Amino acid sequence: MSGLMSFGELEDQFGQISDTTMEEKIPFLQMLQCIEHPFTTTEPNQFLQSLLQIQTLESKSCLTLETNIKRDPGQTDDPEKDPRTENGAVTVKEKRKRKRTRAPKNKDEVENQRMTHIAVERNRRRQMNEHLNSLRSLMPPSFLQRGDQASIVGGAIDFIKELEQLLQSLEAEKRKDGTDETPKTASCSSSSSLACTNSSISSVSTTSENGFTARFGGGDTTEVEATVIQNHVSLKVRCKRGKRQILKAIVSIEELKLAILHLTISSSFDFVIYSFNLKMEDGCKLGSADEIATAVHQIFEQINGEVMWSNLSRT
């Protein structure tokens, strides 16, 4: 057999190995123990079997053994640090149970959302300002103390209440026109600044479930009609035209603690009609429609008298 060495070659090889090396290599020692008397053996088959046994032992030696075990790249020498161990598996499971953080948004997306929010807010404010301007244009200036949103809304509420009361007074007047009125004759009470004429002045007073209405004057003189509902007064004055007449009348009416909320002026030939919407302020001494109609009648008669005397003095 070509793979087997002769006894002489083995002897030469064993002569070159030191004692220390022979002690470390167990297969060679076993070989020497097995082959004590090589020349005394008469059976060549026994010698061949011994050599085969030696080669088998050499193949199993720790010096010549080659391991073909492939190491897992994820496996470590320390079993405690191996992620496939029991503790490692628990750690992986615990990591999977953690709450996933939300991915950060893109800067462009964040900027887009911010610009959209700004545009929506600007549009809302623009619409609100348009509504407030429309509401402001429908109200008299006397209801607007300031130009802020709260004042405009509060003034609109007050104006609506005034309109409701005016509507009630007009409905009362309409019902009153359908009933019989009892005229009464009264004399005009003159003051130090008022010259009373000799003409008779008729005064009509009617009551209704919504308020009290009084008429004062008639004919070619100043005619005043007042309707009182709680602390609101609807006043209508018909008189002849006069220079700066309405300005003086407004000043005198406000001196009576009557706040002018609304004023409408219409004319017919030589006469002019003033429609006032008044509110009785604190400290107003006039409490009834008769008192208000009488006071306003005196104011316009005084103004017309002053105009008449000024015209006479010029001539």
From Swiss-Prot:
Residues 66-111, 172-197 are annotated as: Disordered. GO terms for molecular function: DNA-binding transcription factor activity; protein dimerization activity; transcription cis-regulatory region binding. Residues 172-183 have a biased composition (Basic and acidic residues). This is Transcription factor bHLH57. Pfam families: HLH. Homodimer. Keywords: DNA-binding, Nucleus, Transcription, Transcription regulation. It is found in: Nucleus. It comes from the Eukaryota. Residues 94-104 have a biased composition (Basic residues). InterPro entries: bHLH_dom, FAMA/SPEECHLESS/MUTE-like, HLH_DNA-bd_sf. Residues 185-197 have a biased composition (Low complexity). Expressed constitutively in leaves, stems, and flowers. GO terms for cellular component: cytosol; nucleus. GO terms for biological process: guard cell differentiation; regulation of DNA-templated transcription. Residues 112-163 form the bHLH domain. Induction: Repressed by heat treatment.
